[in-house]
UniProtKB/Swiss-Prot annotation:
Segments forming a coiled coil: none
Gene3D superfamilies per record: NADH:ubiquinone oxidoreductase, 30kDa subunit
Organism: Prochlorococcus marinus subsp. pastoris (strain CCMP1986 / NIES-2087 / MED4)
Family: Belongs to the complex I 30 kDa subunit family.
Official protein name in the record: NAD(P)H-quinone oxidoreductase subunit J
Molecular functions per Gene Ontology: NADH dehydrogenase (ubiquinone) activity; quinone binding
InterPro entries associated with the record: NADH_DH_suC, NADH_quin_OxRdtase_su_C/D-like, NADH_UbQ_OxRdtase_30kDa_su
Enzyme Commission (EC) number: 7.1.1.-
Source organism phylogeny: Bacteria, Bacillati, Cyanobacteriota, Cyanophyceae, Synechococcales
Annotated localization: Cellular thylakoid membrane
Bilayer topology: Peripheral membrane protein
């Protein structure tokens, strides 16, 4: 029987880790490849303290549009996640395929829930970050207007967390 346990070629390693993940690593930005989603979009994870640097670098690679920023809760006792979906937009005549990347930051709900705001890189992250703060309690450091977007300012808790307990009563205020 033949032993097929030879070391993987560098091309196979690149396919496993992802092209963008490998490039970020070569540029000194620690990240973890999470594979590709069902349509082939590469997904990677970075630590909160590396997010701003990673997104700045990705913008330099040509991912010049923040299509979506959001958050989700993996479940009670598990991580809260802030995610970023970036795409590369160029001249509409030259686009053969849209290049996409998704970046995730996993936050332990029992520790610091802060990530850097991307407002200085992508102005469109303003309301998206505010909504994520409002629904999940993830703080965006250096955000220009870190206030609630959908819920009243005096609302307690984060309604889209899976461990959220809905209040029995909340007094509605008249609009006039």
């Amino acid at each position: 029987m033949e032993n097929n346990s030879s070391p993987e070629s560098s091309e196979e390693i690149v396919k496993q880790n992802g092209i963008v993940s490998n490039q970020l690593s070569q540029d000194g930005i620690t990240n973890e490849s999470l594979g590709n989603d069902h349509i082939g979009v590469e997904i990677l994870s970075v630590k909160p303290e590396k997010l701003y640097e990673a997104i700045s670098t990705l913008r330099g690679y040509g991912f010049n549009y923040l299509q979506c920023q959001g958050g989700y809760d993996e479940g009670p006792g598990k991580c809260l996640v802030s995610f970023y979906h970036l795409i590369s937009l160029g001249d509409i005549q030259d686009i053969k395929e849209i290049k996409e990347i998704r970046v995730k930051v996993f936050l332990n709900r029992d520790s610091d829930l802060s990530v850097p705001s991307l407002y200085k890189i992508f102005k469109g992250s303003d309301w998206q970050e505010r909504e994520t703060y409002d629904m999940f309690g993830i703080n965006f450091a250096d955000h220009p207007n870190p206030t609630r977007l959908l819920m009243p300012e005096d609302w307690r808790g984060w309604p889209l967390r899976k461990d959220y307990i809905q209040p029995d009563f909340y007094e509605l205020q008249d609009a006039y």
